[in-house]
Design a protein with these regions (language model features):
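A short, N-terminal "cap"/entry segment at the start of jelly-roll beta-barrel domains
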Residues: 1-63, 155-228, 232, 334-376
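Eukaryotic modular interaction domains in large regulatory/scaffold proteins
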Residues: 219-220, 229-233, 239, 251, ...
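C-terminal flanking tails of non-heme Fe-dependent oxygenases
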Residues: 266, 270-273, 295, 300-376
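Activation on folded, globular domain regions of eukaryotic proteins
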Residues: 21, 30-31, 68-70, 139, ...
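Conserved metal-binding segment of the jelly-roll/cupin
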Residues: 73-74, 109-131, 141-144, 274-296, ...
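A short hydrophobic beta-strand segment most commonly corresponding to one strand
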Residues: 88-90, 118, 133-153, 252-254, ...
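Conserved short histidine dyad/triad with adjacent acidic residue
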Residues: 48-55, 66-83, 215, 232-247
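A short beta-strand-loop-beta hairpin characteristic of the jelly-roll/cupin
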Residues: 77, 81-113, 246, 250-278, ...
């Protein structure tokens, strides 16, 4: 008769299954609120993937999303790999090729620094470094922690022969979206957004619209066909900052360029300030207020990678807002005056003047004049 202690089925465990899987890896696993530069993060060999890698468990991911950094050696091609989930890749350094394969069909596209693309679930893919003199470094985003909580078998997710693609990326419309994103405008109260499988340069992306209600920033919203993830590209003019706001967990923020500062804090508790630049990354914890400031001489931009919409949070298009939160945003008229003073002090150190309109601190209904985009 089998002893109770010998049973192999999954039972409740105080440590999440994803965390226990991390303990089996021989690569670094960082637990941080903020990483100053993903481009210089120490990696280690990952024999299974034949590359150097590390996983960053940000405090704000809270079992929702995964952030992984990998490095492709100079001139190398990583072995084919199939992942059960969609995975999203941002290029921190380098240029190369990505090939997505299903049987005899394949799609290859070129990527470069600041490119962003999706590796669709159920397909084999190969990643190649086109540079022979330096490594390429990538940031990967997926929702493995969340799904592994439901399917607590790591082998299910990696090179699983029983998993087949559930959407055809080789149909003419999908293939076209690897070449050029398309704008979608559904009219009504929904704002226009861009749909594609591949975005060549998020640092240079200039198709923006006003981000009304958040201050003077403009933004682009990027979507991926057949998936629930979206990406926001808020862009702040020189000498400005956004309103403090809060939302749910798992939204990874990475900086493509510029110089700035962010602050995060749980309501009623001490504020944590971080100075950022290209390669910095962080994740605001659930229900923590956070606020972003441009301290540089050029417009400041950050990339916000949102987990699947409609599944975790309320709000339209996965805004990750809580329906029961009466104060999801702090108006400039209500913010702690010390925040404004710190912003202006930081600008002074850099010889930059604040361009925040004095009226926005007096009138909560103040309407910004947007120079970075239009509603059209």
């Amino acid at each position: 008769m089998q002893n109770q202690s010998d049973k192999t089925y999954e039972v409740w465990h105080p440590v999440p299954r994803y965390d226990r899987w991390l303990e089996t890896l021989d690569i670094p696993v960082y637990h941080e609120y903020f990483v100053g530069d993903l481009r210089t993060l120490r990696l280690a060999p990952w024999e299974e993937r034949e590359c150097n890698a590390a996983i960053v468990v940000f405090a704000g991911q809270e079992g929702v999303s995964e952030a992984r950094v990998s490095e492709i050696p100079a001139g190398a091609t990583l072995p084919p790999f199939k992942f059960t989930l969609d995975e999203y890749v941002y290029v921190l350094e380098g240029r190369g090729l990505a090939t997505v394969v299903a049987g005899r069909r394949q799609k290859t596209f070129e990527w470069q620094k600041h490119s962003f693309f999706v590796l669709p679930r159920g397909y084999h893919h190969r990643l190649s470094n086109a540079q022979g003199n330096r490594a390429a470094r990538l940031l990967h985003f997926n929702c493995l922690p969340l799904v592994m909580a439901v399917i607590p078998n790591p082998a299910f997710f990696f090179n699983n022969p029983s998993i087949e693609p559930d959407r055809d990326i080789f149909d003419p419309e999908s293939e076209e979206l690897f070449s050029e994103a398309k704008q979608v405008d559904e009219g009504g109260k929904r704002e226009a957004y861009w749909v594609g499988n591949f975005f060549p340069d998020l640092r240079a992306w200039d198709k923006l619209r006003p981000q009304r209600g958040r201050g003077g920033a403009s933004v682009a919203t990027l979507m991926f066909p057949g998936t629930g993830v979206r990406v926001g590209l808020p862009t702040m003019p020189v000498g400005t900052y956004k309103k403090a706001h809060r939302h749910g967990a798992g939204i990874v923020i990475v900086i493509p360029g510029g110089e700035g500062m962010s602050v995060m804090w749980p309501e009623g508790q001490e504020k944590q300030f971080f100075n950022w630049h290209e390669g910095s990354a962080f994740v605001p914890p659930s229900r923590w207020y956070h606020q972003h400031f441009n301290l540089g001489p050029v417009p400041g931009r950050y990339i916000a990678i949102f987990p699947p919409r409609h599944q975790l949070f309320g709000g339209t298009r996965g805004e990750a807002k809580f329906q029961d939160d009466p104060h999801p945003q702090i108006e400039y008229t209500e913010e702690d005056p010390a925040v404004r003073r710190r912003f202006e002090d930081e600008l002074r150190k850099r010889g930059i003047e604040s361009r925040m309109p004095p009226e926005c601190y007096r009138d909560p209904r103040y309407e910004w004049a947007y120079a970075g985009g239009s509603d059209d």
